[in-house]
From Swiss-Prot:
Protein name per UniProt: Phytase A
Enzyme Commission (EC) number: 3.1.3.-, 3.1.3.8
Family label: Belongs to the histidine acid phosphatase family.
Subcellular location(s) of the protein: Secreted
Signal peptide: 1-24
Enzyme class: hydrolase
Species, as recorded: Arthroderma benhamiae (strain ATCC MYA-4681 / CBS 112371)
Amino acid sequence: MSSMASVLFAALAISGVQVTPSRGYGCFPQYSQFWGQYSPYFSLEGRSAISSAVPPGCKITFAQSLQRHGARFPTADKSATYSSLIKRIQEDATEFKDEFAFLKDYKYNLGADDLTPFGESQLYDSGINFFQRYHGLTKDSKVFVRSAGSERVVASAHKFVEGFNKAKGSEKGGATKLDLIISEEDRRKNPIAPQGCDAFDNDETADKITDQFRSTFTQPIVDRVNKKLPGANIKIGDIKSLMAMCPFDTVARTPDASKLSPFCHLFSHEEFRHYDYLETLGKFYGHGPGNSFGPAPGIGYVNELIARLTSSPVKDNTTVDHELDDNPKTFPLGLPLYADFSHDNSMTVIFTAMGLFNATKPLSPTKITDPADASGYSASWTVPFGARAYFEKMVCDHSPSAKQEYVRVLLNDRVFPLQDCHTDFLGRCKLDDFINGLTYARSNGNWDQCEVSPPK
């Protein structure tokens, strides 16, 4: 944890505010929880109908986490877009009125692609939280850690292991070697960062839906901004970029993201609700259940989860690399703890293949559907920076049989209501029932329809 973050932590603790790594980012919630996938992870414990605590009389015997990398700078192409937009505004605007005054002398110095220091601290804290929750499984075993090959994902996995080991007391810090890094080269079989489904890649539904929703709220913002920046000639497409600068500038300003970017004050809370929903629509119709091939790339990971839950070989004909998964050194079975690290889009297709969003009805392209009315679906609730999903297996004293095993899924500390198995009042399904419900993945879904000719 950075020195600045440590000072903030101590100050909050002295003031009586509970601060733990599991709470996530709590600053500026009226803004930061409405940044779509660019929201920093915040705990959904308070929005869960079921406590995320281990049920009384139960013991966790297995846990697998799937986590997104921490907060980062914009991707290279978007960083170039944002920089160019700000330069154009500074060259063309004849006045910078009111809250836009800072733009006159603002210097764009955001990097590209890599984690910010705040993003690193997110994953360090995540490692601490993972140890605190599952420390009972660490006595005789280590956590097996895999990462997708992007630098920011690998760096996130390293910070997680660093935090985990620090909490365990086994290391004094420093990057720790990962067990496996899987390349993200084009068409490479990689279940934690899947690709290779042409029909999925060629689907244009998300673009059409997001364009439709953007048209419902953006024009009044354009008119207001152009009054504040006469001569800048701001277009509809520029508004999303200006709004995105709010989260990206905030997570880069300080090591603990404790200073809100002045870009945030350019827009109202209601406008950020629309921004959040715009990003949510992009995920739902681009990588989720709104894309008929949305689940297909996630099949391989679900089949890996089945293998780990049952300590049996992986059965998959989609994105799994069997040279890795048939090798006990690179895909060991029978361990109690696993941690995988990936991207937001990859996690969305995996959750979709698992059927987690089966209760979510198609999202409206014309008006906001609140996450509570979408069975908990939104980009900020499911795949924020540093998102974490836990797949737990447990045994309980009150079970009819001492050998009865249960499965429960937590997504950002919310006990996720499983759809394709019989869920009890604690959010659990019997292991066999859970696996039987994963029929889409076990049958390889519609992967055989992925290979299509590119559109002419």
